[in-house]
């Protein structure tokens, strides 16, 4: 939570990783611990997984609806991942930034690149790495969400996704989940205090310097 007595602009906190490295688990933990942090709820054409709630985990829409949003420039970023389409609605993000609300994104490197083209000054990007390839595969299997073909495809894609690590501001190696959560939380808290984000800082400082 920010303790600054002056208004600041919100930030976009990006977590990316190969499937199974822990970004979704870390995202959920940060949302529980950080009251000023909200989730960017993406739209997707993929079907819901067991337990997922429409409007909370994703907005589940048809491919026609997705194409319409792209055509009308209603998406901040969009990408095709494992045969399904994902995108970030523009309106809620713009409103949050203006109201000092921080938004966390659980997106891949393609989406991150698109956001950099539009809102680079508002971004804080973190890439989550697994401690080893063997551990990544173990985590994918332990989720029991995917069949064997999908697991092989995710492992094949992991090397390509990891190759984009250098495009991110911060790296977290998720060896221990709790430590990784705390590291991500520390990054978020430090970034909130950057001078350029505190929009009312000049007026506040002038008031302190007045006789």
Residue ranges of predicted features:
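Extreme N-terminal, non-catalytic leader segments
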Residues: 1-12, 35
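NTP-dependent small-molecule kinase module
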Residues: 2-3, 145-146, 160-211
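Residue-level preference for the first positions of well-ordered beta-strands
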Residues: 10-14, 102-104
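Conserved glycine(s) of the Walker
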Residues: 17, 22
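Short, well-ordered alpha-helical microsegments
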Residues: 23, 111-113, 180-181
């Amino acid at each position: 939570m920010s303790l600054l007595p002056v208004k600041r602009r919100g930030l976009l906190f990006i977590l990316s990783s190969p499937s199974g490295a822990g970004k979704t688990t870390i995202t959920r933990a940060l949302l529980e611990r950080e009251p000023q942090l909200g989730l960017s709820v993406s739209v997707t054409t993929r079907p819901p997984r067991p337990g997922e709630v429409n409007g909370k985990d994703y907005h589940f829409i048809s491919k026609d609806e997705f194409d319409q949003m792209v055509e009308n420039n209603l998406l901040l970023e969009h990408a095709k991942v494992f045969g399904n389409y994902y995108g970030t609605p523009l309106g809620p993000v713009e409103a949050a930034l203006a109201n000092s609300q921080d938004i966390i994104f659980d997106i891949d490197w393609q989406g991150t690149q698109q956001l950099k083209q539009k809102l680079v000054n508002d971004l804080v990007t973190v890439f989550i790495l697994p401690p080893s390839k063997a551990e990544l595969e173990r985590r994918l299997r332990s989720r029991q969400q995917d069949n064997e073909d999908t697991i092989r495809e995710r492992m094949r894609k992991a090397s390509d996704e990891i190759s984009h690590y250098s495009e991110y501001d911060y790296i977290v190696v998720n060896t221990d989940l709790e430590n990784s959560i705390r590291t991500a939380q520390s990054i978020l808290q430090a970034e909130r205090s950057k001078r350029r984000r505190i929009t009312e800082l000049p007026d506040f400082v002038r008031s302190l310097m007045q006789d």
